[in-house]
Design a protein with these regions (language model features):
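Typically the conserved alpha-helix immediately C-terminal to a functionally engaged Cys/Sec
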Residues: 208-225
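Thiol-/selenol-based redox modules, centered on thioredoxin-like
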Residues: 145-150, 160-166, 272, 276-309
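C-terminal motif of bacterial Sec signal peptides marking the signal peptidase cleavage site
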Residues: 19-22
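Thioredoxin-like thiol-disulfide oxidoreductase module
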Residues: 236-264, 269-273, 295
Length: 309
């Protein structure tokens, strides 16, 4: 089943206009917890928060805005963060709108430093149809992240590659599988002396509005930069062939479990000494990802960390 077809089915199942129901045959504990959705305003607007694994310190904060007609794509937005009530702390940050690669939708992205853990509130202000719109939501900031954080050593989990499967279909649920994304193990990539981009995703099973065609982004960037950077897709399911015929038969892959990922789509950049330099929960566009990768192709990046480029 192709990504587009599955995502269309998914949107039908959840009822994109009401966002209140889900498909029983793809439901599990993750779908109740991710993504975080705000209440729907009287005007019919809602925030879908893609980045829920937040901790004290600097974080990428990304969200989607929905209306009764679908995705809202607007520049010139502002988000205000309100700390737990007893701390009386406020942060105001401009938000950059990043179009997804299909150019029909996008994410609002900013970087923010949270000084305190606890329950935070936020307010998004934007202009839609010449009207000022304000949408409020809430989220939790933890002391530490659940998934590996920037600066952590990348977990060396044994992912499947072309060398240890009988059929390429065992590597991904996607309908188009690019062999270049399955040539190296995580261990081999880390030891190569090059930076590495790893995406954890199941292309045929995007479960929510924050999920997108991430593997296609990887293919696009791999074609452009694969001589200097390793690109790896790790399927989150261990048995993609069986899963195509039975939604309920899915078994999580060992790398997905070892990395302790609290939602279904993640992308990480690993520097040339095996440390995580960037992490992206939910979909990340090729524009945003490539912007981070350019550092490793500069003189500063190669001299400091990347002897093999």
């Amino acid at each position: 089943m192709s990504y587009n077809r599955f995502f269309s089915i998914f949107l039908f199942c959840i009822g994109i206009t009401t966002l209140t129901t889900s498909c029983n045959d793809i439901e599990d504990s993750f779908t109740d917890e991710y993504p975080i959705k705000s209440s729907i305003t009287q005007e019919g607007y809602q925030i879908v928060l893609a980045t829920t694994d937040l901790a004290v310190g600097e974080n990428r904060f990304a969200f989607i805005v929905l209306s009764e007609k679908g995705f809202i794509n607007r520049d010139n937005s502002m988000v205000t963060f309100y700390a737990p009530i007893k701390l009386s702390h406020e942060l105001k940050e401009p938000v950059q709108f990043m179009y997804w690669d299909d150019l029909t939708r996008g994410s609002f992205v900013t970087n923010v430093v949270f000084p305190y853990p606890g329950k935070w509130n936020f307010k998004v202000d934007l202009l839609d149809k010449k009207e000022d719109i304000s949408i409020q939501g809430e989220f939790t900031v933890n002391e530490k992240t659940t998934a590996p954080d920037e600066g952590d050593r990348a977990p060396v989990a044994k992912n499947k590659t072309l060398d240890n499967v009988v059929s390429i279909q065992q590597l991904s649920t996607g309908d188009t599988i690019d062999p270049e994304l399955y040539r190296y193990s995580i261990k081999e990539a880390i030891e190569s002396g090059k930076p590495t981009v790893i995406t954890f995703s199941s292309p045929a099973f995007c479960r929510d509005e924050a999920c997108g065609p991430q593997v296609k982004v990887l293919q696009k960037l791999s074609t452009r930069r694969n001589s200097s950077i390793n690109f790896i897709h790790v399927e989150i399911y261990d048995n993609p062939v069986e899963l195509q015929n039975d939604f309920k038969s899915g078994l999580y892959s060992e790398p997905f479990k070892k990395w302790n990922l609290p939602s279904f789509q993640w992308t990480f950049i690993i520097n040339c000494i095996g440390e995580i330099s960037h992490r992206y929960q939910g979909f990340v566009s090729s524009e945003e990802l490539d912007g981070a990768l350019r550092f490793y192709l500069t003189e500063r990046g190669t001299k400091n960390l990347c002897s093999a480029i």
